[in-house]
Curated annotation (Swiss-Prot):
The gene is sufS. InterPro entries: Aminotrans_V_dom (IPR000192), Aminotrans_V_PyrdxlP_BS (IPR020578), Cys_dSase_SufS (IPR010970), PyrdxlP-dep_Trfase (IPR015424), PyrdxlP-dep_Trfase_major (IPR015421), PyrdxlP-dep_Trfase_small (IPR015422). SUPFAM superfamilies: PLP-dependent transferases. The modification N6-(pyridoxal phosphate)lysine is found at residue 226. GO terms for cellular component: cytoplasm. Belongs to the class-V pyridoxal-phosphate-dependent aminotransferase family. Csd subfamily. GO terms for molecular function: cysteine desulfurase activity; pyridoxal phosphate binding; selenocysteine lyase activity. Transmembrane segments: none annotated. This is Cysteine desulfurase. Gene3D superfamilies: Aspartate Aminotransferase, domain 1 (3.90.1150.10), Type I PLP-dependent aspartate aminotransferase-like (Major domain) (3.40.640.10). It comes from Escherichia coli O157:H7. Pathway: Cofactor biosynthesis; iron-sulfur cluster biosynthesis.
Length: 406
């Protein structure tokens, strides 16, 4: 199948609207991607004609809803090439998935004197849960430092591991810098030291194929809303042997086998024992439609198109005076920048006046901001529906802001 950005754009209703009297140029998909009609329609159709509570229902609607939900689990397992659909847990998003691992596996396996390794480029969602776990149990949090070009100082990684290292928690792709970390060698090194590996894939799965078996990671987590799906739904992958050993971290309906006031409670098997309560079934249906949509476009096609667009954007941005770019030349998805000494909020506000949507702030990466000694950055992100013309508008807008503000 040949990739056509025009055909893709026609599937996203919001891209036809105007902002401040100008066509919308949506360059904020790394925060949350827009949704194609196929996703919107699938979720709406479920609520209109197929909604029911899943699991244990004997009536037709419940049985059909349960089947649809479990089919999405199967589709998601194929999407990341898991060995089994039963290695996947539905979560609210990447943040909940990481917290689940920290509170279930972490509480059972990390002890006083142990250590966990993260990096200086992590999103807060892959920092704070580990800080909280370390504080609870008396463990140490170790950090892989950054190079100025936005890559990790990988030569320091072997010195951070020891016999007390229990986990390496690392982002696949930086949400600020676009750096794609060399996971294969990092995971191999971690396993050589007996440590498990969690990968934050929130900024990776929409840009190119991900194969969790080839990576050999122990945990992989991503969100639906950055993958053109609904909010409030995501996937946590855990190797089956690990998942079966992990205790539940939330209690309630659906995650039990038996409940007795005198004899206590026994759990159902994984992954369902990690899905307490009524699930976000509509969101799951929408996620399934998003996975189907992205797969139909072809992730390799998407990767090729987006990389060409990224190369074009980086080359065109060289024409903007006083523009500071952050991150390596080879990157995925995002371009973080500042214009002169102007605050990112001011630059972002001007761009919004021109109909261009970018993200401004610390991007849930305060340690990274501290490393670059800036309070905030602007971030333009590129998705499969963005165009060369939108990149040109961004460049022209920044040039205009520079002329206005100096």
């Amino acid at each position: 199948m040949t990739f056509s950005v025009d055909k893709v754009r026609a599937d996203f209703p919001v891209l036809s609207r105007e902002v401040n009297g100008l066509p919308l140029a949506y360059l904020d998909s790394a925060a949350s991607a827009q949704k194609p009609s196929q996703v919107i329609d699938a979720e709406a159709e479920f609520y209109r004609h197929g909604y029911a509570a899943v699991h244990r229902g004997i009536h037709t609607l419940s049985a059909q809803a349960t089947e649809k939900m479990e089919n999405v689990r199967k589709r998601a397992s194929l999407f990341i090439n898991a060995r089994s659909a039963e290695e996947l847990v539905f979560v609210r998003g990447t943040t909940e998935g990481i917290n689940l691992v920290a509170n279930s596996w972490g509480n059972s396996n990390v002890r006083a004197g142990d250590n966990i390794i993260i990096s200086q480029m992590e999103h807060h969602a892959n920092i704070v849960p580990w800080q909280m776990l370390c504080a609870r149990v008396g463990a140490e949090l170790r950090v892989i430092p950054l190079n100025p070009d936005g890559t990790l100082q990988l030569e320091t990684l072997p010195t951070l591991f020891d016999e007390k290292t229990r986990l390496l928690a690392i982002t696949h792709v930086s949400n600020v810098l676009g750096t794609e970390n060399p996971l294969a060698e990092m995971i191999t090194l971690a396993h050589q030291h007996g440590a498990k590996v969690l990968v934050d894939g929130a900024q990776a799965v929409m840009h190119h194929p991900v194969d969790v078996q080839a990576l050999d990671c122990d945990f992989y987590v991503f969100s639906g809303h950055k993958l053109y799906g609904p909010t409030g739904i995501g996937i946590l992958y855990v190797k089956e042997a690990l998942l079966q050993e992990m205790p539940p971290w939330e209690g309630g309906g659906s995650m039990i086998a038996t409940v007795s006031l005198s004899e206590g409670t026994t759990w159902t098997k994984a992954p369902w024992r990690f899905e307490a309560g009524t699930p976000n079934t509509g969101g799951i249906i929408g996620l399934g439609a998003a996975l189907e949509y992205v797969s139909a476009q072809g992730l390799n096609n998407i990767a090729e198109y987006e990389q060409n667009l990224m190369h074009y954007a980086l080359s065109q941005l060289e024409s903007v005076p006083d523009l500071t770019l952050y991150g390596p030349q080879n990157r995925l998805g995002v371009i973080a920048f500042n214009l002169g000494k102007h605050h990112a909020y001011d630059v972002g506000s001007f761009l919004d006046n021109y109909g261009i949507a970018v993200r401004t702030g610390h991007h849930c990466a305060m340690p990274l901001m501290a490393y670059y000694n800036v309070p905030a950055m602007c971030r333009a992100s590129l998705a499969m529906y963005n165009t060369h013309e939108e990149v040109d508008r961004l460049v022209t807008g920044l040039q205009r802001i520079h002329r206005l503000l100096g």
